[in-house]
Swiss-Prot record:
One of its GO terms (biological process) is regulation of cell shape. Catalyzes the initial step of the lipid cycle reactions in the biosynthesis of the cell wall peptidoglycan: transfers peptidoglycan precursor phospho-MurNAc-pentapeptide from UDP-MurNAc-pentapeptide onto the lipid carrier undecaprenyl phosphate, yielding undecaprenyl-pyrophosphoryl-MurNAc-pentapeptide, known as lipid I. It is found in: Cell inner membrane. The gene is mraY. This is Phospho-N-acetylmuramoyl-pentapeptide-transferase. Belongs to the glycosyltransferase 4 family. MraY subfamily. Its EC number is 2.7.8.13. GO terms for molecular function: metal ion binding; phospho-N-acetylmuramoyl-pentapeptide-transferase activity; UDP-N-acetylmuramoyl-L-alanyl-D-glutamyl-meso-2,6-diaminopimelyl-D-alanyl-D-alanine:undecaprenyl-phosphate transferase activity. GO terms for cellular component: plasma membrane. It is a multi-pass membrane protein. Its cofactor is Mg(2+). HAMAP family: MraY. Keywords: Cell cycle, Cell division, Cell inner membrane, Cell membrane, Cell shape, Cell wall biogenesis/degradation, Magnesium, Membrane, Metal-binding, Peptidoglycan synthesis, Transferase, Transmembrane, Transmembrane helix. The chain crosses the membrane at residues 28-48, 74-94, 100-120, 137-157, 193-213, 225-245, 262-282, 289-309, 314-334, 369-389.
Length: 392
């Protein structure tokens, strides 16, 4: 918004020449981070008071951690604060003609809406299950598949008109069209090594990354500050990849595919980092507010979408290792319990409690120890991921 205003003012008079600073992506990214941070810090107390007044408090299940019983009633659905700060800062500082930012906003707000309905049913309607699994996965699939099909064509072409032409050409070919190498799955640490996915393969991978990341972040969001800081770290690292792939010079030098327009995602990533830090101010132990599904599902979906656009799905898998392990721990626990119950007549567990962070709590770790150690691991994983920029 401000970029368009600055460009318009420059056409009116040379006196507005100083507004050329708005053309610099790095400046707008820094301002987006600062804007989201300030908006989050200023609006945070009001949002928390409103949530408390509406009695939107976090229910704690009886079979959960005993040490978490004191958290019962803490305001939840604080993810609306994060999403508002991200959306406000992004819309203020990004180039409105950029299609990649719009699709990331679509996924973010789409998953946020799904999470909002889930939280509302749990907290307000007192339905412990919230949205049923099939219903939730259906709507997640709708958002994920729409994003997958759109990105298939928008990554391949640089203009919306060419995107539309490519879509019709794909349909006319019987869904058997050769796409540019840009949509291939890149393998980190190796020069110019990639695996062709094809159109359908790309859509399936995109769907799995977006929906998987959304649910993985949601599963991680179980302790004060546990999920939000890894989101900030991974999002910031993905912003670096977005800047590289969006630059014809840097992408050529570092042997990355050049995806025109993807650099603008740095503005969104910066806004997400600023909003995340603002939320952490209120979410750090002891938390004044919880993110809820409205925030966790949305942020996970956003990270997955950005990873797909910048063609760094495997690197995202590495940097978001905490999210991956948390999700695997839940799946392994459920599958092993069902298997042993069927075979031995009684369900057995791999972990003391799932997700993994609760296992460590049951093992004697304090909540703050689990959180900070998971942060440190995420920081190391992000550094490994960033090293793939040069170590190839």
């Amino acid at each position: 918004m401000l970029m368009s205003l600055a460009q318009w003012l420059q056409t009116l008079s040379p006196e507005f020449g100083f507004l050329r600073v708005f053309q610099y992506l790095t400046f707008r990214a820094l301002m987006a981070a600062l804007t989201a941070l300030v908006v989050g810090l200023v609006a945070g107390p009001y949002v928390i008071r409103r949530l408390a007044a509406l009695k939107i408090g976090q229910p704690v299940r009886g079979y959960g951690m005993e040490t978490h019983l004191t958290k019962s009633g803490t305001p939840t659905m604080g993810g609306v604060l994060v999403l508002f700060a991200i959306a406000f800062a992004t819309l203020m500082w990004f180039d409105p003609s950029n299609r990649f930012v719009w699709i990331v906003l679509w996924v973010t707000l789409g998953f946020g809406a799904i999470g909002w309905v889930d939280d509302w049913r749990k907290v307000v309607r007192k339905d412990p299950e919230g949205m049923r699994s099939r219903e939730k996965y259906f709507w997640q699939s709708v958002v994920g598949l729409i994003a997958g099909f759109y990105l298939l064509f928008s990554i391949s072409e640089s203009s919306n008109w060419r995107v539309l032409q490519l879509f019709f050409a794909w349909v006319q070919s019987g869904f058997d069209l050769d796409f540019p190498p840009k949509i291939n799955l890149l393998v980190p640490f190796f020069k110019e090594v990639s695996y062709p996915l094809g159109g359908i393969g790309f859509v399936i991978l995109t769907y799995l990354v977006i929906v998987g990341a959304s649910n993985a972040v949601n599963l991680t969001d179980g302790l004060d500050g546990l999920a939000i800081m890894p989101v900030v770290m991974v999002g910031s690292a993905l912003g670096v990849f977005a800047y590289v792939t969006g630059s014809a010079v840097y992408s050529k030098y570092l042997l990355f595919p050049n995806i025109p327009g993807s650099g603008e995602l740095l503005v969104f990533c910066s806004a997400m980092a600023g909003a995340g830090l603002a939320f952490l101010w209120f979410n750090t132990h002891p938390a004044q507010v919880f993110m809820g599904d409205v925030g966790a599902l949305a942020l996970g979906g956003a990270l997955g979408t950005i990873a797909v656009i910048v063609r760094q799905e495997i690197v995202f898998f590495i940097m978001g290792g905490i999210f991956v392990v948390e999700a695997i721990s839940v799946m392994a626990q459920v599958m092993y319990f069902k298997y042993t119950k069927k075979r031995y007549g009684e369900g057995r567990r791999v972990l003391k409690m799932a997700p993994l962070h609760h296992h460590f709590e049951k093992s004697g770790w304090r909540e703050t120890q689990v959180v900070v150690r998971f942060w440190i691991i995420t920081m190391l994983l992000c550094l490994i991921g960033l090293s793939t920029l040069k170590l190839r």
